[in-house]
Amino acid sequence: MVGSGTDSRYLMYFFTASHPKIGEWLKADMAKHNFCFDPDYRAWDNPVGGSDQQSFHLKGVPIVWYHTGGQPNYNFPSDEAQTINYPKLTDITRASYLTTWHLANEAEY
């Protein structure tokens, strides 16, 4: 859940290593929009795991994955709305939109 996590600024930003522009876009958008998170950029050659990006990667589709490190109650009945960091969730949503915009408007993609 991108709005959760124990550190209010922490964000892992995974992207397909063979598409470095995807990492460059967030860096440029960070400078322009002053988002409330501090990304740890992680270019990935071979993403593994059970998250949603895996099936896209296996088909050769470049991936982006925002991960906030989770929180102890994630996917449990004790997981409640008060654990969501709404400003961070909002900024990650904005950054995701901008990444999608870049993908749609770059001739390479």
What are these regions (language model features)?
Residues 4-109:
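Active-site-adjacent substrate-binding region
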